[in-house]
Regions:
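Glycine-/charge-enriched secondary-structure boundary and capping motifs
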Residues: 2-155
Length: 155
């Protein structure tokens, strides 16, 4: 059996160079944050890189969860909420970018062989009505929050 781990360093560095060339004014930076989704799941890892006062919405139906996670869920009788709070469910890296840079960022990642799409949108918390499970304040970080809503797709 062979297990593979995707390495994101090169694509993240290329993304930073493409979106924010050296010498760019810090006020104009389009790559806002990177979140390597490891232990703790997607929402907790993403919430930690967002500043307090911001919330990201993530629609669970926005990607197809790799089959191995559904097998674990079914054979282990593990609820989706427990899986999403522990595992990455197929999303290993999230780039938080300015809205106008989203298509360019996804295109660059895909050219590098990394599947990419717009995962959600970042909002100010005062202007946002959550639609699902809100995750914030994880691992002692007083940062932003993530609203995970909808249903996972396994096919």
């Amino acid at each position: 059996m062979k297990f593979l781990t995707r390495l994101y360093a090169r694509v993240c560095l290329d993304l930073a160079d493409a979106l924010d060339p050296a010498g760019a004014d810090p006020a104009d930076l389009r790559l806002r944050a990177l979140s390597h989704v490891t232990g703790g799941g997607l929402a907790a890892n993403l919430a930690r890189v967002l500043p307090a006062g911001l919330i990201a919405d993530v629609d669970r139906s926005g990607w197809v969860v790799p089959p191995v996670f559904d097998v674990v869920r079914r054979l282990g009788d593990v609820p989706w909420e427990d899986l999403e709070g522990t595992l990455n469910l197929g999303i290993g890296m999230v780039a938080v970018v300015a809205p106008e840079a989203a298509d360019d960022a996804a295109r660059l990642a895909r050219r590098a062989g990394v599947p990419a799409w717009v995962l959600g949108t970042v909002h100010e918390t005062g202007d946002y009505a959550p639609r699902g499970r809100v995750v914030a304040g994880t691992k002692g970080v007083d940062g932003g929050a993530v609203d995970v809503f909808g249903s996972y797709r396994t096919r």
